[in-house]
Amino acid sequence: MHRRHFLRAAPLAAIAAPTLVHAKDGVFPATEPHTKRFDEQRWALDNIIQANGIDWDQGHVSVLLRACGLDIQNDMAALRARVKKYADIVPAFEALARKREAMAIEAEKNDEPIPARDNYYTAAAYWATSMWGNEVHGERLRHANDKKRELFTKYIGLADHHIEWVEIPYRGKSVPAVFHLPPNHQAGGKLPVVVMVPGMDGFKERSVSLNGDGWLERGYAVLAIEGPGYWESPVRGIFIDVQGWVETGKEVAKWLRARPEIDMDKVAATGSSFGSFFAAAMISEEPAFKACAVTGTCYDLAGHRIFDEASPTFKKRFMFMSGIADEAEFETFRQTIDWRPFAGKIKAAFLIAGGESDELCPLEATEAFVKALGGPKQLMVYQDSRHSLSGPSAANGPEPRIYQAEWITRRLKGAPMQNERWFVEASGKVDKTAIA
């Protein structure tokens, strides 16, 4: 415990809780995280991956297809053929990244800017994805991060719209982000902006799709951020800190105010999976945010279901994000994963889309969070759907991501809304009831 420091109790004064500890920023664990379930069930995990493939816990392939496009279908087929156990994931993505980088370089030599652009984007996404499953702070992780940034920078130089790297101040350091302006944006024009917080297995470079991105097509600027504990931030020694996300929201607003392109009356946020929790923390004390929409919820207090009942990889990964290698220490730290201190402070309009049968967060936890919100709210529950919001209800009812974008657009235009709970049946029929 010599490398830990105790938090002040004041931010959580409203909630009775044990004394909490956080990792010291900049101090890396000497080993990878170790958990009892992961170590004892590794044989079962590997057999499940062999039987079900790389999507055993979440739809990793579908997310990459949505970001990179159908051109990577053969890559994904090769990935499925290669990945037969957990240890296969990192080298499989590294190999795909090297292949795509070579294709990009060859396309540039042949004066083919579009294939070069597409392959640099895809190679960067593969290098970033190779960081998932690598929970050791070492040269391999740093190399993957460096390659991701190198190749995404090359993509930026060929992209069809303005993109820039961003650093958001954070406690004397900074957390990374990527800023996009929609194609054909004219200097002097004011834009709405969405601040995107990915899930714990997501990253900022993938947050805006290579082609046909829904936010850019709707004329939004996008700031995709990796706050404390997210993807690149742990490489910098910046770990999970709920209050740190609250502080990050204020710094994001300061950064946006300094941008001449941004209409500060039209600022929204989105969150996916664990990003649903951290996006809520981010906006809770910053009035600049007028709306927030999240999918795939993570509101179970202390992450009980995701850490204790789901794939043991989730807990191991979150320990890495928290800068903690010892499971007993993490058991104390996880008590900070609690929305009760900030949910009531949220006055922005809030949309929550969750699955009735979410395996990572019980519906009751999501409903409790919704009840605690301090502003206008809408809850959408997809019948029989799991965490990834798929199946008949998502296919036949309002498509979650499209509805999210249109809902935010209506909120930023000032359209009125009702506090409602929508239950989306498998047929697509929507049953609406009022909520307090």
Range-by-range predicted roles:
Residues 5-24:
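N-terminal export signals
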Residues 93, 146-185:
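N-terminal cap/lid segment of alpha/beta-hydrolase-fold proteins
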Residues 189, 193-259:
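Cap/lid segment of the alpha/beta-hydrolase catalytic domain
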Residues 281-329, 348:
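Hydrolase active-site cap/lid region
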Residues 346, 352-354:
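Short beta-strand/loop motif that positions the catalytic acidic residue
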Residues 373-388:
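Catalytic histidine neighborhood in serine/cysteine hydrolases
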Residues 385-397:
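Catalytic histidine-centered segment of alpha/beta-hydrolase-like enzymes
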Residues 395-436:
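Catalytic active-site module of serine/aspartate enzymes centered on a nucleophile-bearing elbow/loop
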